[in-house]
Amino acid sequence: MAAAVQDSRVSPGEILKRSPKKKKKMKMVAKAAASKLEDEVKDSSDGEGSCDSEMDHSDDGAAEADSEDNVESCEEDNEDAAESSAGTNSGWADAMAKILNKKTPKSKATILTKNKELEKEKEKLKQERLEKRKQLDKKREWEMLCRVKPDVVKDKEAERNLQRIATRGVVQLFNAVQKHQRNVGEKVKEAGGSVRKRAKLMSTVSKKDFISVLRGMDGTSRNSPAGKSPKARQTEVKSEESPGWKILRDDFMMGASMKDWDKESEGEEPAGGRAEAAASR
């Protein structure tokens, strides 16, 4: 019983010290109290500093009153300078605004000096183009000089005559080619199967043979042999030996000179003689 009585007489502080959870709570409470004390000390020190600064401001008040006059005079000078600079800046700004807001056409350059140079170059190019056009016009006029468009309605007879002459010439040419081929074929048959003779014969064939055949065709096409006298046939044989068309002769216009330009050729009759012969008939 005595031991139980002694245990009941133990103080509550000792009981708290014995339990670990209660020890932690006590530590947290002590820390909070210490932090509160530190905050109070800081607040008191800040109040003392503010009081000292107020005392310093009161001592400097007289010096500030003396310097206010100087500050006002400086401010007036600065205001005058600002007004003058503002006037110049506003004029400059107005001029720049006019330049920037000015609308220039697309054909002209924004820089005037370059615009003048471009205009000079354009004028030079225009002059060169005009000169080229003039040269082309002169060339076309020269090419079209003495050119006349044919009128089919008015020149029907002339066109028909030209067509007849063309058809006659083509027919005569093809007949001459056929005749020349026939003559060459006959000569090849006469030569036989020897290659040497054929080669020799083909080497003798030339343009002159074909031209002689063409000249003979020209002479025979003008006059047919049917119903002619032996004298006419003799003349035809002579004409076959000599070319029918004088222009195809090798010696055509070889003996002519400038003195005989107004004289008629030997084969041609004077126009008066032909007219008299026609009248007598």
Swiss-Prot record:
Q: How is it modified after translation?
A: Citrullinated by PADI4.
- Modified positions (Phosphoserine) are S11, S58, S67, S206, S265
What GO terms in the biological process aspect are recorded for it?
Answer: rRNA processing
Identify the Pfam families for this entry. Rrp15p (PF07890)
Q: Which residues carry this modification: Citrulline?
A: R9
- As annotated, the Glycyl lysine isopeptide (Lys-Gly) (interchain with G-Cter in SUMO2) covalent link is placed at K108, K179, K208, K238
Give the coiled coil ranges: 63-144
Q: Where is this region: Disordered?
A: 1-115, 214-281
The UniProt regions of compositional bias labelled Low complexity, in chain numbering, are 272-281
Q: Which residues are recorded with the post-translational modification N-acetylalanine?
A: A2
Query: Which residue intervals are annotated with compositional bias (Basic residues) in the record?
Result: 18-28
Cross-link type Glycyl lysine isopeptide (Lys-Gly) (interchain with G-Cter in SUMO1), residue numbers: K238
Which positions bear Phosphothreonine?
Answer: T104
Q: Which UniProt keywords apply?
A: Acetylation, Citrullination, Coiled coil, Isopeptide bond, Phosphoprotein, Ubl conjugation
Compositional bias (Basic and acidic residues) = 36-45, 233-252
- Positions with biased composition (Acidic residues): 61-82
| Family of this protein | Belongs to the RRP15 family.
PANTHER family listed in its UniProt record: RRP15-LIKE PROTEIN
Could you tell me what this protein is called? RRP15-like protein
Q: Which organism is it from?
A: Mus musculus (Mouse)
Question: What gene name is listed for this protein?
Answer: Rrp15
